[in-house]
Amino acid sequence: MHMTVLFASPRAAHSNTHALLVPFLETWRAAGHTAEVFSLFDLHIEPCRACRGCQMDWEYPACVLADDMPAIFDAVLRSDILLLAAPIHSWFCPAPMKAALDRFVYALNKYYGPRGRGPSLLSGKSLAILTTCGYRPEKGADLFIEGMRRWCRHTDMRYVDALTERHLGYDHTFMDAEKETRARAFARLLMQP
């Protein structure tokens, strides 16, 4: 199985989300699966303009904006599963991920053009979420998770599940053996058909 990971932490390799992603990816790859990781804070991603230029081509994203999204579009279209890996700030994902998600809604869903409703290029793909937050998961990540469930219904994707781990504060160590075990178990869960 091939996975595209959209990683969106402003603290990059020093982040709690990255600490959780490492054992997840080790387990995923050790089982013979592949993953392509995009660190969104390192890329140039313009916000969607809702210009509908992408709606003229029903076979390809065809976004008219010139930035780093074409490589992400291509990777997602080649993937079986999309993993959103991000900290939760203000009850939602950081801005680069939100910008990418908005671009997917238009460029990969041909619902808005002059020819009427076309296909979703994401149809049948799976989506999973790996997040970290400061609140209890049911109060910190719940709105983002619900938003992504609705996003999956809109895009005709299959929502699989989410792993959310809590950080108790900068004076506490985030990563521990229990979190690592849950990250590895989450990778194994996503390997199931």
What is the predicted function of each stretch?
Residues 112-158:
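Short, glycine-/small-residue-rich phosphate/pyrophosphate-handling segment
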Residues 1-3, 157-160:
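Short coil-to-beta-strand
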Residues 32-34, 60, 124, 156-159:
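A generic structural signal for alpha->beta connector loops
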Residues 1-109, 114, 170-193:
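N-terminal beta1-alpha1-beta2 submodule of the flavodoxin-like/Rossmannoid cofactor-binding fold
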Residues 161-166:
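Beta-strand-loop-alpha "switch" segments that mediate conformational coupling across diverse proteins
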